[in-house]
């Protein structure tokens, strides 16, 4: 073969565009809907087209690309697609701010970000690209909605929302700031409006059970989070008979997982929206005002534990089901109507929220559990202690039930109350049905029609998709679809009368719950996914994304897979066989603080740093004025802290390969990555050294390729061993461990070994050549542009290259290094045959000149640790 010559210096911004153009021209990464042989589907969570890539994107997509390129080298056909999660509130907000249609803003962002992603050098099949805001995509979302509605898996009910009376619009919880609308500043009201819900609770047990099938492929942390979110509990429904039958005949039913504490109930609390609360407020203006206050300031479930406890007595009473004692009914803001029956039996002695409430309103506290290892005399009704909430213990102050432990008490109360119709055992889930209606414009239209005669009617399938008008510029005052009769005026498909099209749109989590399936056949016009493509590519073999999506997105995608499975669209029960959750990208923060406490954050790119000899930052100045700023430590890159590093700037300065290598080397993928300019420079230096190694080798012009294994010098044996050990390690690190950082470390070691090696004959040259081409092939998943360019000099096309095979014979050692100690201190080293005898080893150890000078007295002991060391005790 002919050896080429290359520029002695690495010029990333010259080679990367030409390599990318080559991939595009040859459609290297295009795959068919169905393929023969080994194949694999690698997917990173698709981005929202916010306008610019951030470093979190770079990390996510580089991880996916490293895995994809690795399996391509292993001879597999790999599907790695890309698309855009394109509906959503940020586009509406940007449209309002810039007076531009969300569609225009979104597609301009997509064009820019697509260009950025291509510059990263991703091995993506761009022919499969789609945006979820196109009718070709959401047509099939609407089709599935219609099927599910007909099966009863979607229903409509009233739901409480945040209403901005000035902007005349519904606000998401995060758009409410201190009780006011984020844009108008108006006091937010609570309103009840009809919304559509998915019956995800019908699948709660299946969603829980099938987590067991993901045990080997998903992080334990994510499985635990999903289990907790689904929240299966076995408890008891207990009815407290009414003591005011003339007002409320039915009694009050509660659900509890702590039936063992029943004898400690001192009051019952209901949610503000509970029918009993509303009944009690009919002739009580003060109570009615309190209920309204609770409605306006409703607390999210996540904040319940820390929110201030508010309550008011209803004046009504219920009877304790065992003792008949009358217990007051209170309205409490920590009870949610959406959980259980909207009522709780309060046991202040053994529940922290009840304890806090009882102390605030001077309600009785009665201890009924004597926790194991706790002194009964230690119980204090004024200061909560951790053991008060323990299930481990025996009942006290509970009459005939004294001495029983948790399960025995549960069984005893059930046996006593069930025959009276006052209790039954019940399994309950924390998971709530999924409300998907959004009073927003920029989303998928809900394919429903409201008819005064026929009620809610699905849009006929031959009229799908219901297309969202795209030439709309929202002004922030409500959903513009409500002002567009050309959109909402329609005829009822059932009776033919005038009807109104639904103007709510779907939660954008719906689009991202099935997109992975659409990639298998994105141009298919006969359904969600072509059956043979679904059979070929699904489920996704490896899914990659941030751990912040551990609950909602992943749960909804699992739910949708089961819905599609039950519709016969896909096979199998789970969408993602393996999941890798990457950590956050952190960067230094810098700020100044005004007298009023307001902080102004400065981007690291505009900061001049002074470091100590260990590289730690000791002072920082803003380059705009030369004045000092406060060093805030490392935090997640974010707009709020202004500490994002623009990936484009890194690519422009160093090249995509440097950005990729840094991202993969700086930390294990599941841990936080600390941004470091020095680390980026280090990655770039590494690639420059690889380039120079190849340039130097090519310069010598020796084209020897055949290795004569029987006649290798010791140095050549060592380099071959290093080469094949590296193949073994990199393969294991990428495939099994996802330890990309240690894979790169191994490549750095192979580079060092290759640099030190001096070829003395053709056999040595062939060994060196093997080491270099192996290094380039193993580096290819991380730095594909550099690898493709350099491998071409050896006559290899990276796109057709295969992962090197390990030569087991290269791993065997004929010699070994033995450490020689005198009295436990290192005094010398020996290179000896692996089958040397003990006597010969001792003789050679004693003969070492650097050892002999310490052998001054008689030798008391000779210690030999096989294959490792000799220790002579004198």
Swiss-Prot record:
Single GO BP term: leucyl-tRNA aminoacylation
Instruction: List the keywords (alphabetical).
Output: Aminoacyl-tRNA synthetase, ATP-binding, Cytoplasm, Ligase, Nucleotide-binding, Protein biosynthesis
**Gene Ontology cellular component annotations, sorted alphabetically:** cytosol
Instruction: Identify this protein by name.
Output: Leucine--tRNA ligase
Motif position, 'HIGH' region: 47-57
Q: Where is this motif: 'KMSKS' region?
A: 636-640
One term of GO molecular function: aminoacyl-tRNA deacylase activity
Pfam families given in the database record = Anticodon_1, tRNA-synt_1, tRNA-synt_1_2, tRNA-synt_1g
Catalytic activity annotation: tRNA(Leu) + L-leucine + ATP = L-leucyl-tRNA(Leu) + AMP + diphosphate
Instruction: Cite the EC number.
Output: 6.1.1.4
What HAMAP family does this protein's entry cite? Leu_tRNA_synth_B
* Gene giving rise to this polypeptide: leuS
Q: Where does ATP bind?
A: 639
| Compartments (UniProt record) | Cytoplasm
Q: Does the keyword Protein biosynthesis apply?
A: yes
Q: Looking at its record, which EC class is this enzyme?
A: ligase
Q: Which InterPro entries match?
A: aa-tRNA-synth_I_CS, aa-tRNA-synth_Ia, Leu-tRNA-ligase, Leu_tRNA-synth_edit, M/V/L/I-tRNA-synth_anticd-bd, Methionyl/Leucyl_tRNA_Synth, Rossmann-like_a/b/a_fold, tRNAsynth_Ia_anticodon-bd
Q: Which family does it belong to?
A: Belongs to the class-I aminoacyl-tRNA synthetase family.
